[in-house]
């Protein structure tokens, strides 16, 4: 009966965090709107080989992540949940692997359940795992690779070893098809310390070629298909998206070596108090085969991405699966021997909640700021934010009431965040970051437009997805669409600022022309270098400018 109660509690936890509140959050630009529109166009066109964004070739990522996202929209429709269904599915599958792997390592059902709950409630896992980007997919394939390699190396017979390495190759191949060749580098770097300490080089060299073969065979069908359709895909994807993004001096998202230290700290909430002990205990027990394996899969990817010049918080998502297992193992030891770390964890959560309550007041309409984050008419959003942090502090306090037994309730600290964050976003943020909000406000003006131009790729993708059309034209800026716009068949999909007046004269009689521009909050739109408009509708950071036929 206790096992049944635990399962019911786990399903309720998943429903409250990963299912029920997802539709209440509008899509964020540029990431979510971009991937939503790519998958919508894939479904609309039936082209499952070449990814397109706004009808243009889009070679920044391979195809597998778009496949999963497209299936999500196909099953659940073109809505907020449908767009995020793929990443939620991948996150839950990763959690299932955490359960299985923990159970296999320690043969303890309670430990396996706790590791799963810790993983799903980690702030970084929840934030990225309910956000429509490709990182939850690559995290799943990397964790699957971690499990496959362990299976292979623990097998006694050649059949088991062969099957494990073949499975490892498939996971690496799917990782390559999701986000590229990093899916090969990370597993190799992660297993080397374990192989070295356990002196298992012989098995690696004898069976490793099976992983190489299955990886190549996994990628080959689509790799050949896109090479035939778009011969320059692999050149662009390898040199620009890998070498330039991660290694060169002009890499995207440049950040210092220590960039991931605050990411690890914030991402470990509400279990931050367990982080030092989990890592220290893992290192102290490094002679234990399973512990050093998990520690290696936590530390090595972190070091790899720290050395790379281009950095984003999402890159290290896969590190938190083995870290959650180490945390759960350490937490049970602490509860049994010395619960100091569990008490510290409770106080950290109380401090975080109280700090959030105070910060919310400071930026509220009743605080000391001259330009508050929320306006007076958004009072209910302030109370939602207070509720988020109040619940965080409350469950932090509750874990201290009988810490040896109540410490797992720290998993409920982000409950308010999960349920209420969609209702607490300030309008000033929504107007710039949620194109759906803008579309809702301007639907009647946008719908009959013959041409729609915008100066932001994220806004363009949001408009395209909301209006179910891929013919949005880029104005003044090309952004990440620069490469796709260079193709001859993309002529007419970009209008520069200098050309706009002439372009307008040529196309005005064809129907309503709508210009959607991103502007600064205090910018005077009358100073924009554009022809006089027939209608202007400003929604704070976004402004709709319309020209009607004369």
UniProtKB/Swiss-Prot annotation:
Localization terms from the record: Cell inner membrane
Keywords, sorted A to Z: Cell inner membrane, Cell membrane, Glycosyltransferase, Lipid A biosynthesis, Lipid biosynthesis, Lipid metabolism, Lipopolysaccharide biosynthesis, Membrane, Transferase, Transmembrane, Transmembrane helix
Statement: the UniProt record of this protein carries the keyword Transferase: yes
EC class: transferase
Pfam families attached to this UniProt entry: PMT
Catalytic activities: 4-amino-4-deoxy-alpha-L-arabinopyranosyl di-trans,octa-cis-undecaprenyl phosphate + lipid IVA = lipid IIA + di-trans,octa-cis-undecaprenyl phosphate
InterPro entries referenced in this protein's UniProt entry, alphabetically: ArnT_tfrase, Glyco_trans_39/83, LipidA_mod_glycosyltrf_83
One CC-aspect GO term: plasma membrane
Membrane topology: Multi-pass membrane protein
TM ranges: 7-27, 81-101, 111-133, 137-154, 165-185, 204-224, 255-275, 288-308, 315-335, 346-366, 382-402, 406-426
One GO term of the biological process aspect: response to iron(III) ion
Keyword Cell division applies: no
Enzyme Commission number(s): 2.4.2.43
Summary of the function given for this chain in its UniProt record: Catalyzes the transfer of the L-Ara4N moiety of the glycolipid undecaprenyl phosphate-alpha-L-Ara4N to lipid A. The modified arabinose is attached to lipid A and is required for resistance to polymyxin and cationic antimicrobial peptides.
Family of the protein in this entry: Belongs to the glycosyltransferase 83 family.
Pathway linked to the protein: Lipopolysaccharide metabolism; 4-amino-4-deoxy-beta-L-arabinose-lipid A biosynthesis
Organism, scientific name: Escherichia coli O8 (strain IAI1)
Gene Ontology molecular function: 4-amino-4-deoxy-L-arabinose transferase activity; mannosyltransferase activity
Name this protein carries in UniProt: Undecaprenyl phosphate-alpha-4-amino-4-deoxy-L-arabinose arabinosyl transferase
Domain of life the protein comes from: Bacteria
């Amino acid at each position: 009966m206790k096992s049944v109660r635990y399962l019911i509690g786990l399903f309720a936890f998943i429903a409250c965090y990963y299912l029920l509140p997802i539709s209440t959050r509008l899509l964020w630009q540029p990431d979510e709107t971009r991937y939503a529109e790519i998958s919508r166009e894939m479904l609309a066109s039936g082209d499952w080989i070449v990814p397109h964004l706004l009808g243009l070739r889009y070679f920044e990522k391979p195809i597998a992540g778009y496949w999963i996202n497209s299936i999500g929209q196909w099953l659940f429709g073109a809505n907020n949940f449908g767009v995020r269904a793929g990443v939620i599915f991948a996150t839950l599958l990763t959690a299932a692997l955490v359960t299985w792997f923990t159970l296999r390592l320690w043969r303890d059902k309670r430990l396996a359940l706790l590791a799963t709950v810790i993983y799903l409630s980690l702030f970084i896992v929840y934030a990225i795992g309910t956000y429509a980007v490709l990182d939850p997919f690559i995290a799943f394939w990397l964790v699957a690779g971690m499990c496959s390699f362990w299976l292979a190396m623990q097998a006694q017979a050649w059949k088991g070893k062969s099957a494990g390495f073949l499975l490892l190759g498939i996971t690496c191949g799917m990782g390559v098809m999701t986000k590229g060749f990093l899916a090969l580098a990370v597993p190799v770097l992660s297993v080397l310390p374990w192989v070295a300490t356990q002196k298992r080089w012989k098995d690696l060299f004898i069976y490793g070629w099976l992983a190489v073969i299955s990886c190549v065979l996994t990628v080959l069908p689509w790799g050949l298909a896109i090479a035939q359709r778009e011969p320059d895909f692999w050149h662009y994807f390898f040199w620009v998206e890998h070498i330039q993004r991660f290694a060169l001096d002009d890499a995207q998202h440049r950040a210092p070596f220590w960039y991931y230290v605050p990411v690890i700290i914030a991402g470990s909430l509400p279990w931050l108090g367990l982080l030092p002990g989990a890592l220290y205990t893992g290192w102290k027990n490094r002679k234990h085969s399973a512990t050093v394996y998990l520690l290696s899969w936590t530390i090595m990817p972190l070091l790899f991405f720290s050395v790379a010049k281009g950095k984003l918080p999402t890159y290290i998502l896969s590190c938190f699966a083995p870290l959650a297992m180490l945390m759960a193992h350490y937490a049970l030891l602490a509860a049994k021997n010395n619960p100091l770390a569990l008490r510290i964890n409770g106080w950290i959560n109380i401090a975080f909640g109280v700090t959030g309550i105070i910060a919310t007041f400071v930026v509220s309409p009743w605080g000391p700021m001259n330009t508050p984050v929320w306006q007076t008419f958004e009072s209910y959003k302030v109370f939602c934010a207070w509720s988020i942090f109040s619940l965080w502090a409350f469950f932090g306090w509750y874990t201290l009431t009988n810490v040896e037994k109540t410490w797992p309730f720290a998993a409920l600290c982000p409950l308010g965040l999960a349920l209420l964050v969609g209702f607490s976003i300030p309008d000033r943020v929504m107007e710039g970051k949620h194109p759906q909000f803008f579309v809702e406000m301007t639907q009647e003006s946008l719908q009959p437009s013959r041409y729609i131009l915008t100066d932001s790729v994220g806004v363009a993708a949001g408009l395209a997805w909301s209006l179910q059309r891929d013919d949005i034209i880029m104005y003044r800026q090309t952004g990440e669409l620069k490469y796709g716009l260079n193709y001859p068949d993309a002529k007419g999909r970009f209008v520069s600022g200098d050309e706009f007046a002439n372009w307008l004269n040529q196309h005005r009689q064809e129907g309503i022309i709508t210009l959607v521009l991103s502007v600064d909050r205090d910018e005077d739109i009358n100073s924009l270098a554009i022809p006089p408009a027939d209608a202007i509708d400003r929604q704070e950071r976004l402004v709709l400018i319309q020209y009607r036929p004369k």
